[in-house]
Amino acid sequence: MSSTNNTSNNIAPVHIGLVGYGWWGKIIAKQIATSNRLKLLAIVEIDEGMRQQMASDPFLKDVQVLSSFDAFLKITELEAVILCTPHLLHADQIVNAAQAGKHVFCEKPLCLTFSDAQRAIQSCVQHKRVLGIGHERRFEPSVIALRKEIGAGVFGTILQIEANFSQDKFFALPKDNWRLSNKHAPVGPLTATGIHLVDLAIAVLGPAESVWANLATRGSYFENGDTLGIMLAFPGGANALISAMLATPFEGRFAVYGSKGWFEIRDRKHPENPAGWDIKRVMQGQEPVTSFADQSPTVLANLEAFAMAIRGEQDYPVTHKEMLANVAALEAIMKSVISKSIETIAAPV
């Protein structure tokens, strides 16, 4: 069932195409199938064996399967594309899609360098295309409510954020998978999971100004690391302490500490198969309050927000400045794990 409904106002679904039909691409395709705001027309998949499997998949019987991104962009009916591709490819694919008149939804991270992110965003602005980003954690109902309360001053001055997004799912991947490659996914715990927490920290505190980070491979054979610690510093003195590991069972936690109280969100299961969130709230002079928030289709909510922006119903809720701030932080983190020093983060302009 779709998280929003557009049948009453007869808004046509956005004709969309998917680039990459791996682990996450399959999840995206299943989410699209539940939406009346999106219609999947085509998929690009370069792996011949995968394309053969797709040809006999009844789920894809009305979907065109191609091997060429260029041919895909020439499909006239296609309004938008979703990129589930290796990170190094994102910038050029965004630029090419925007030049072809397509709106673009890119899985995280948007790009691996600040200059590439600037180039990609500028192309979308120039061609008046909507750019979406796969930071679905922003769409969790508890995160939305928390940000509103922070904005209203309920928690006072925000002092610090503590967050953890760890998993061991990558042990199931072939050893030559691009997600385990130092070239295609440098600082693996960051590009896999930690970048979501960087985004949430920016959503709460704004762009960060400096970072120190440490990366190691301690519990796996992953060449791009499995254990990452990050300390982001923000203007005014607030910090975000972020932990991301790829060699331990799933943990998802986001906590914001303020001068009047604090708020913690814990995932019960991995976002791939969500089971809701345990919430803890502690206000100054009061007893702790715990509650449960039922699971919500956040991936779908993000995709439908993208579709609504394309149709002019609303602005896409992640700004270009926030996207740039995220990639600026990512690039500085990657520098810090090499230099072992505090690195300055580029201002998102």
Features from the language model and the residues they span:
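Predominantly a Rossmann-like dinucleotide-binding segment in NAD(P)-dependent oxidoreductases
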Residues: 137-214, 218-221, 340
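Hydrophobic residues in well-ordered beta-strands that form the structural core
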Residues: 67, 106, 131-133, 162, ...
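N-terminal Rossmann-like dinucleotide-binding module
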Residues: 1-60
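C-terminal helix-rich "cap/oligomerization" subdomain common to oxidoreductases
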Residues: 1-10, 80-82, 305-349
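Active-site loop of classical SDR/Rossmann-like NAD(P)-dependent oxidoreductases
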Residues: 27, 290-304
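Contiguous beta-strand/loop segments that form the cofactor/metal-binding neighborhood of enzyme cores
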Residues: 192, 198-272, 300-314, 348-349
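Conserved SAM-binding strand-loop segment of SAM-dependent methyltransferases
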Residues: 62-69
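Beta-strand-loop-alpha-helix segment that lines the small-molecule cofactor/substrate pocket
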Residues: 80, 86-138, 153
